[in-house]
């Protein structure tokens, strides 16, 4: 590993992990020196560190957190973020409000301490300007790289003890520049509008100056040539439970079970929660007992409808290391579970969401890159919950909106990143029968004044 020490304005020294001093051009920007060192040592990991942080850094953790080639990490002990809370007017993804207690996915990087592989750095050579503002350079690189498969994290393990040092803060001019260069132009106007309405500020000169910069959205960066194989282990027992909430889809669920029975890596047990809100109704899933299955089936029948409740009932019965959260109207290939676990091993991720599309979904609209996901798929994901088996869906969102996203937030706040992979793909049949097709009467539906947006949206 090569470490680049700096004082926020320029590089002060560069040393290797064997304490060899490496020459550099002190007149260049920190970003330029970083890129030059990456070109000089393309097979090394590169770290940057503010000189005031040197005594607080946990260098032993770097090989552990940089466990595969497409990882970029940094950490700032400060509550303040470089781009400020105003960036929340532009982006509402989970990557903005960072949990500093755990390893957390975010493109918001810090110049204080961080690192990545030189092989990734060189892919940005000539693509983005190696400017004097090192924090801007790092944030730009992470923001552009994340949708292309670069896994970016705030990692508190980089410090032994958190130092009390201020986080550099972007000016309002820099903030507007960042928004214009990395988002659609309409967000620049919306941020100006929000600052006017909610903060009584009118930074018109920052707004106008931002329009002079060049966009960075289509600059031809590709990370596909970089091989990923994590040195970290997340698959030990390789046991899998499948949970399936179902309502009124007997034939579709049967096909799902048949697909599971043909798996090259069989699940240990399949947990089915069958719902029928009609009083006096009984289970219609006779084939659960009438046929032989190569896995244990746990069947729960309930009159209480609701996907959140059903999934929670299923999660309480999980015994395996991994959980495949499935739907009752999907189809999967015979090697689905095997390939899913192989991907989890490759990236050492504890939560994987798979591409899940209908048969007529346009091929050109499908996501083709592996990347950190800003949501979560409750019917198309595998998750390692062995250490976090207390996690449950929030029933406040029952029959509403966003329970998938909220469960994903719970995972991230436990230090579990959600990674999307396009393969193996799940076919979603979107069954025309069953499911939750009766519109529920929620608490606020009979109110004279209807809340807009609805409480579940505002939640």
Protein language model features and the residues they cover:
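Acidic donor-binding segment of Leloir-type glycosyltransferases
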Residues: 8-10, 19-23, 257-301
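N-proximal low-complexity "stem/linker" segments adjacent to membrane-targeting elements
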Residues: 1-18, 160-161, 197, 201-262
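Glycine-rich, basic loop-to-helix element that forms the pyrophosphate-binding segment
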Residues: 25-39, 299-318
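Active-site-adjacent helix/loop segment of glycosyltransferases
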Residues: 148-214, 428-459
